[in-house]
């Protein structure tokens, strides 16, 4: 476990993120819960906690600096990625975690209780049925960018942003058709030799 903690500290340093030992323990406790539930409920395709450390934890932390304001909705959150990871980092920020699969929300309610994460609100619904005001609308491996926009455009205002976490495929053709101001960022994930990108979308003024 000390080796994993050292790896987290190194990743935090590379990402220029300050975190406490309590937060590091919370991230590890979360991954252990995810690994445990995964054996029964198939929460994620990644089964090994060492692999989860990089492909889930570090991948989620790599977009932390792009989160603005006080509230975020995590669309198709699955096992809580990136929402739970970011909620541990930003305890004053409210995260609404949305998924249509009941067992995943059941898991997230367990995470909330086990880790005393009072700033997450897991909701079992389809995103198009949710109402609310959020500074960030984020998705990771949820859908194509144009589908993400169509399902979530009712949240978009002049003051907030949509963030799509993507791999190599930036869906350039889909992006060109969207009536939005779009910025693309190349994301470096510590210990991961794979292309990661973040697409930030805002309403045209």
From Swiss-Prot:
InterPro entries recorded: rRNA_ssu_MeTfrase_G, SAM-dependent_MTases_sf
EC number annotated for this UniProt entry: 2.1.1.170
Keyword tRNA processing: no
Organism domain of life: Bacteria
Keyword S-adenosyl-L-methionine tagged: yes
Signal sequence bounds: none
Binding site for S-adenosyl-L-methionine: 76, 81, 127-128, 140
Biological role stated in the UniProt entry: Specifically methylates the N7 position of guanine in position 527 of 16S rRNA.
Full protein name: Ribosomal RNA small subunit methyltransferase G
Name of the gene encoding the protein in the UniProt record: rsmG
């Amino acid at each position: 476990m000390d080796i994993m903690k050292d790896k987290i500290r190194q990743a935090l340093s590379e990402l220029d993120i300050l975190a406490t030992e309590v937060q590091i323990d919370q991230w590890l406790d979360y991954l252990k819960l995810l690994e445990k539930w995964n054996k029964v409920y198939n929460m994620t395709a990644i089964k090994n906690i060492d692999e989860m450390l990089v492909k889930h934890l570090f991948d989620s932390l790599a977009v932390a600096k792009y989160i603005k304001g006080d509230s975020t909705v995590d669309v198709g959150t699955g096992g809580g990625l990136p929402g739970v990871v970011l909620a541990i980092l930003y305890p004053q920020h409210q995260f609404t975690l949305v998924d249509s699969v009941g067992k995943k929300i059941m898991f997230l309610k367990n995470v909330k209780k086990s880790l005393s994460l009072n700033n997450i609100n897991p909701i079992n619904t389809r995103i198009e049925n949710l109402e609310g005001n959020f500074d960030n609308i984020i998705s990771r491996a949820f859908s194509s960018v144009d589908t993400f926009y169509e399902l979530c455009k009712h949240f978009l205002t002049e003051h907030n942003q949509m963030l799509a976490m993507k791999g190599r495929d930036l869906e350039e053709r889909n992006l060109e058709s969207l009536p939005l101001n779009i910025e693309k960022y190349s994301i470096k994930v510590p210990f991961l030799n794979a292309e990661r990108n973040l697409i930030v979308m805002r309403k045209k003024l």
